[in-house]
Amino acid sequence: MSLKWTSVFLLLQLSCYFSSGSCGKVLVWPTEYSHWINMKTILEELVRRRHEVTVLTSSASTFVNDSKSSAIKFEVYPTSLTKNDMEDSLMKLLDIWTYSISNSTFLSYFSKLQELCWEYYYYSEKLCKDAVLNKKLMTKLKETKFDVILADALNPCGELLAELFNIPFVYSLRFTVGYTFEKNGGGFLFPPSYVPVVMSELSDQMTFTERIKNMIHKLYFDFWFQIHDIKKWDQFYSEVLGRPTTLFETMRKAEMWLIRTYWDFEFPRPFLPNVDFVGGLHCKPAKPLPKEMEEFVQSSGENGVVVFSLGSMISNMSEERANMIASALAQIPQKVLWKFDGKKPNTLGSNTRLYKWLPQNDLLGHPKTKAFITHGGTNGIYEAIYHGIPMVGIPLFADQHDNIVHMKVKGAALSVDIRTMSSRDLLNALKSVINEPIYKENAMKLSRIHHDQPMKPLDRAVFWIEFVMRHKGAKHLRVAAHNLTWIQYHSLDVIAFLLACVAAVIFIITKCCLFCFRKLAKTGKKKKWD
């Protein structure tokens, strides 16, 4: 770490020492890529507010690493995995999810998806074990006396560290497949009649047929699909803690869940007191563009520009597909800024420039930006919402298809299928989004909703973390459902008891009726005999 940031940490320690005790120590268990981009925004704000932030990351991390331009501390622990292992696994997951399993039948799709999830969580478990079983590391962290743990719920382990150190923890999360962790670890409510199951690509306005589809998805995820080897994780947690427990039981102790969406994006649904929505917390006003880029944008005149990015996880695409996309972009009057890392397409038009990196937020906030071509990642969508820019979605994997469905239902986007689209499909979608005023109007409506909040999303996220530190938790917000078994939660024991009572009453009444009938029959026979 540089001398500059060593001095910063010293000043932070001194300011905390002389303050009224408002500074806290935060331990972070992160997840890679866009998850880290979002979480890092929270951490930088915590540091700005004089909290000491330590990120626990492995030597195999590809995205979460020490930055000399940041006051965030990084505790790097060794692992037998390598950066190549992590990158190869991710590229395999992206390729299969984007181009293979999307064409599968229902059962085949979820069977392949489960295989991908199990491979992902194999690496997650390995990283967790390498951290938790590192006695030197655990001793060092325990002696630091952290006040709270901030963890991404997608990667289990943060809750285990919290149990080991006996400190409260807060989750940051977008979603998990089938809402597995949210339902089993958080007690979230998802009524299937109007809340679409994640990855079902449905809206909250479902027809009878769509409700059947949604129910099938729910039942499949609840009773068949396993996001990871549950028994293996439960056994690992029990061994580490020295008592019988489960992953979900440990997750239920979360003080707060910070969900990275908001009602400008979500369909309305019920949620618990210890859940808050902080979508778009990374968004901010646009800054000036680099000189060369600004000149290119200004050269577009009244036609404006289109911003095109498929995110940080897609580094290249096939030559055929790139040429098809470039051909469509060449036919619009707007200038195009395309985030692209690959061979220059032969059909690239004079109106299109390729960049390995784009200041996406600053471009979306530029007054000349007319549309955003996006893969549908949550971070990118929120930047478009923040600045009121209509979208053309090219979803690839994970929640991206659902994200674009949300924007389509709200009238701020159109979508095309990357596996089947032609130049004409992309061109028509772009023309519609740019030339039909309704898309811009709806995008601006979402933007106004996003900005009209009593507290900014970032301030709200930091508030809850500080709240948990101040009060040593937030137990008063956790519903009693967390302490109930599955049978108790669904009142199956009560229903069984009441059914038994009804059965007993029916049995007694039946016996009494039979007894009376026999008595009457005997009396009748006796009178007849007499």
Swiss-Prot record:
GO annotation, cellular component aspect: endoplasmic reticulum membrane
Modified residues (N6-succinyllysine): K136
Subcellular location: Microsome membrane; Endoplasmic reticulum membrane
Residues modified by glycosylation: N65, N103, N316, N483
Entry keyword set: Endoplasmic reticulum, Glycoprotein, Glycosyltransferase, Membrane, Microsome, Signal, Transferase, Transmembrane, Transmembrane helix
Segments passing through the bilayer: 495-515
Membrane-related topology note: Single-pass membrane protein
Assigned EC number: 2.4.1.17
Domain of life (superkingdom): Eukaryota
Disulfide bond annotation, renumbered to this chain: none
An annotated Gene Ontology molecular function: glucuronosyltransferase activity
Reaction equation(s) it catalyzes: glucuronate acceptor + UDP-alpha-D-glucuronate = acceptor beta-D-glucuronoside + UDP + H(+)
Stretch forming the signal peptide: 1-23
Predominant localisation class: membrane
Family: Belongs to the UDP-glycosyltransferase family.
Stated role: UDPGTs are of major importance in the conjugation and subsequent elimination of potentially toxic xenobiotics and endogenous compounds. This isozyme has glucuronidating capacity with androgens, such as testosterone, dihydrotestosterone (DHT) and 3-alpha-diol. It is also active on catecholoestrogens including 1,3,5,10-oestratriene-3,4-diol-17-one.
Protein name, per record: UDP-glucuronosyltransferase 2B20
Lineage: Eukaryota, Metazoa, Chordata, Craniata, Vertebrata
Gene expressing this chain: UGT2B20
